[in-house]
Amino acid sequence: MPWIQIKLNATNDNAEAIGDMLMEETGAVSVTFLDAKDTPVFEPLPGETRLWGDTDVVALYEADMDTSLILQQIKASNMLAEGFAHKVEQVEDKDWEREWMDNFHPMQFGRRLWICPSWREVPDPQAVNVMLDPGLAFGTGTHPTTALCLEWLDNLDLTGKTVIDFGCGSGILAIAAIKLGAAKVIGIDIDPQALLASKDNAARNGVEDQIEVYLPKDQPEGLVADVVVANILAGPLRELSPTIKGLLKPGGQLAMSGILDTQAESVAEFYRDDLELDPIAEKSEWCRISGRKLG
């Protein structure tokens, strides 16, 4: 069965209210918030909805709904400016989960490392293969920030080292580190769902005994590592710089991503006094900052 989709542009201030209006007053069967400009979203305050500054509100309706009436109702709500921009289109009903699975293919990072969906055959059984089922947590390797961190890990000699994955998400970086030779990896994340996804993916790869995961409040005191990787966002990387630097042994190596190229210098400033920084690596407007801790 086809559906009608209406897309409206909103701001962080009114997107949630517009979504509520579309559900309650116009008969939408679902409302989705999308990033309108491919910009990062920062952690919300407690009780806030996590949204972008420029947000597309996308409503889905049954095919027999009168779109002209829906647009009149939206106009009558006075929640959008006169002559508001909108896009109406018909979308075909699909098995969206199956389509996503069909389009998620094995990917190579660096010389040795492959990330493979758990439902596909590995292309090179002799390579370092991470089998991944992302579940509800971020991190599949398709985003440039994840790719930058995976390539960095592939280029290191991790044999026998301890690694901290700060903001572990799906566990993709933690598992890759183990597969690349690390003796032990500690994953830290503020989201309990991420810890569950990391555990599940670690078990799928047979490395669950080498990976520990913690909420920040539960992590062991005095925790330090030879290598720290933090694929989060520029804001937290600045705000948490004392914590992140404190996790690194003297001479240890750090990589950070989740940073737009326009934010790189402002993040680097928080680490330059304590680390010998490498040249910034860039991919599709995102970047990686890495270096070695002095001392």
From Swiss-Prot:
It comes from the Bacteria. The keyword Transcription does not apply. One of its GO terms (molecular function) is protein-lysine N-methyltransferase activity. InterPro entries: Ribosomal_L11_MeTrfase_PrmA, Ribosomal_PrmA_MeTrfase, SAM-dependent_MTases_sf. S-adenosyl-L-methionine binds at residues 146, 167, 189, 231. GO terms for cellular component: cytosol. It catalyses: L-lysyl-[protein] + 3 S-adenosyl-L-methionine = N(6),N(6),N(6)-trimethyl-L-lysyl-[protein] + 3 S-adenosyl-L-homocysteine + 3 H(+). GO terms for biological process: methylation. Gene3D superfamilies: Vaccinia Virus protein VP39. It is found in: Cytoplasm. Keywords: Cytoplasm, Methyltransferase, S-adenosyl-L-methionine, Transferase. CDD domains: AdoMet_MTases. Methylates ribosomal protein L11. Belongs to the methyltransferase superfamily. PrmA family. This is Ribosomal protein L11 methyltransferase. It comes from Vibrio cholerae serotype O1 (strain ATCC 39541 / Classical Ogawa 395 / O395).
